[in-house]
Amino acid sequence: MSVSLSRLERQLGYTFKDQELMILALTHRSFAGRNNERLEFLGDAILNFVAGEALFERFPQAREGQLSRLRARLVKGETLALLARGFDLGEYLRLGSGELKSGGFRRESILADALEALIGAIYLDAGMEAARERVLAWLTTEFDSLTLVDTNKDPKTRLQEFLQSRACDLPRYEVVDIQGEPHCRTFFVECEINLLNEKSRGQGVSRRIAEQVAAAAALIALGVENGHE
């Protein structure tokens, strides 16, 4: 094992029994051969479960939608990339030459994906308890800063934060119709996001309100919120 990987293990607070799992977790799809995408898929599921379980225990009075919003804040790409930078994770990534030249080792989505892959690798290496312990340790500061006040955000903000947590493109809003007299108009808006096959719709007495209604409909369609808040 190289000295550099030993240093990373110290930063992560975990020593791998199977070094190949660690190396695979650090291998981007631009690199020849096997890559970390499957481990990322597994790590994402574990991260969401561990964060959800911890929030369920920490906020016993919170409603389902509030818990979902708190979790989205915890697991969003921005948060994961910040953690990854704290581990200097970019220095250890295996990237293809093109990705390396374009600065992929600094890219938020690549760093966040690699951290999720490491969570998946730890799970395969030592089981759920080891993965849970690392996730909770890494997110201690973020957990301690959360309050239910964080859930009092408008639907557009909540939708944007959810999409950012999944490293997805931001929603696109379009006014498709305006009806009524100038002093009493109704705006009709469509919200398009890549995760949904159909556009979400909203209407209101202003464009802003119609966009908020469309964003709320998108959150329900995604299964993030149930509409009974």
Curated annotation (Swiss-Prot):
The terms under GO molecular function for this entry are:
double-stranded RNA binding; metal ion binding; ribonuclease III activity; rRNA binding
Q: Which residues form the RNase III domain?
A: 5-127
Question: Catalysed reaction per UniProt?
Answer: Endonucleolytic cleavage to 5'-phosphomonoester
Q: Name its co-factor(s).
A: Mg(2+)
Record-annotated active site: 44, 116
- Per UniProt, residues of the DRBM domain are 154-224
Q: Which InterPro entries does this entry report, sorted A to Z?
A: dsRBD_dom, RNase_III, RNase_III_dom, RNase_III_sf
UniProt record similarity statement: Belongs to the ribonuclease III family.
Q: Which PANTHER family match?
A: RIBONUCLEASE 3 (PTHR11207:SF0), RIBONUCLEASE III (PTHR11207)
Q: How does it assemble?
A: Homodimer.
The molecule here is called: Ribonuclease 3
